[in-house]
Amino acid sequence: MAQKEGGRTVPCCSRPKVAALTAGTLLLLTAIGAASWAIVAVLLRSDQEPLYPVQVSSADARLMVFDKTEGTWRLLCSSRSNARVAGLSCEEMGFLRALTHSELDVRTAGANGTSGFFCVDEGRLPHTQRLLEVISVCDCPRGRFLAAICQDCGRRKLPVDRIVGGRDTSLGRWPWQVSLRYDGAHLCGGSLLSGDWVLTAAHCFPERNRVLSRWRVFAGAVAQASPHGLQLGVQAVVYHGGYLPFRDPNSEENSNDIALVHLSSPLPLTEYIQPVCLPAAGQALVDGKICTVTGWGNTQYYGQQAGVLQEARVPIISNDVCNGADFYGNQIKPKMFCAGYPEGGIDACQGDSGGPFVCEDSISRTPRWRLCGIVSWGTGCALAQKPGVYTKVSDFREWIFQAIKTHSEASGMVTQL
């Protein structure tokens, strides 16, 4: 169990506090149960989680949008803006990008359970980040509709055993987890969004750690000493311009603790290296949902880093509770959230920062893991009423998409608001 004497609140990486998990006894798992996701617009199913209102067919890649007024699924009528619509649709579902798109004809491909069409308002399309805001029911006289293949994410390629809390994990279980190393030493965790982009915490890159040629990204292994993992260099780091400690070293405001790392070349996607999904647009966390945090950080506050990747399941705590006087006393801002047990015992610690907090759902029919949080900061490790604090990824979806599109050719340290 991670322990700390005293109560100073510090970033998880204050001496690079990067994602590592502390072992402890899991209590209350059964009592807490698995809470469901709250979705802005959904199709309720009696036996499963709500479906997200934008779907892509696994059979022929057709895009389908739910008409909540009529209670039916509709196809997207093909237009001159198919590339933009395909990309926006994939992003809305939590995929990083559309890989390809095409047209299908309803007369030959069939309706396959859908009923009618939506058309896109192409004039409004450049000014929106939500497909649902720019579509309306239409006739689609040509009967041609849009299909898209989104970059796959959030799925393991190997069968794995279930492990509960604060223990060594197995190869391929969390294939999006990477280690960010500076001069060969593990400093932070990170999550693969694609073969060449990693999402992590901004505080992993203070002034003293900004020589990019000294950074390496290690992937495809669970043991830090494994000879089988892959290491790649870093081309650029894009960090949030609103992360105040980079402007004022005395600032204790930890909002906007998020950064993207662009690799010097793409990692090959294998059974052990896979990207994680982002939250879908409008998808919100529900208090009490039990999710998983992983990392190689310290197993105790004053202890050593874990040699093998650790994992632990912890519940999300409401911001109202976490801002209470006995917890963090109004330090939890809207773009943060807490996760852990009030009694402590299981938590992220130094060496865990920047690492993934992931939750599984079935809102896209296929079960997928989504990156809901980034290990950010906390008081000590695994202390009672001092749970880990995470950057809320759902509030940074548009920042992520824009940063990747804007800075794909950049090099060095780059800032983006």
UniProtKB/Swiss-Prot annotation:
| Record GO cellular component, one term | apical plasma membrane
Residue span(s) of domain Peptidase S1: 163-405
Q: How does it sit in the membrane?
A: Single-pass type II membrane protein
Reaction equation(s) it catalyzes: Cleavage after basic amino-acid residues, with Arg strongly preferred to Lys
State the family it belongs to: Belongs to the peptidase S1 family.
* Name the UniProt record assigns to this protein: Serine protease hepsin
The positions flagged as active site in the entry are H203 (charge relay system), D257 (charge relay system), S353 (charge relay system)
Q: What is its EC number?
A: 3.4.21.106
Name all SRCR domain ranges. 54-151
Keywords noted in UniProt: Cell membrane, Disulfide bond, Glycoprotein, Hydrolase, Membrane, Protease, Serine protease, Signal-anchor, Transmembrane, Transmembrane helix
A GO molecular function term, named singly, is: serine-type exopeptidase activity
| One GO term (biological process) | regulation of cell shape
* Membrane-side (Extracellular) residue stretches: 45-417
Provide Cytoplasmic-side residue ranges. 1-23
What organism does this protein naturally occur in? Homo sapiens
Q: What the protein does?
A: Serine protease that cleaves extracellular substrates, and contributes to the proteolytic processing of growth factors, such as HGF and MST1/HGFL. Plays a role in cell growth and maintenance of cell morphology. Plays a role in the proteolytic processing of ACE2. Mediates the proteolytic cleavage of urinary UMOD that is required for UMOD polymerization.
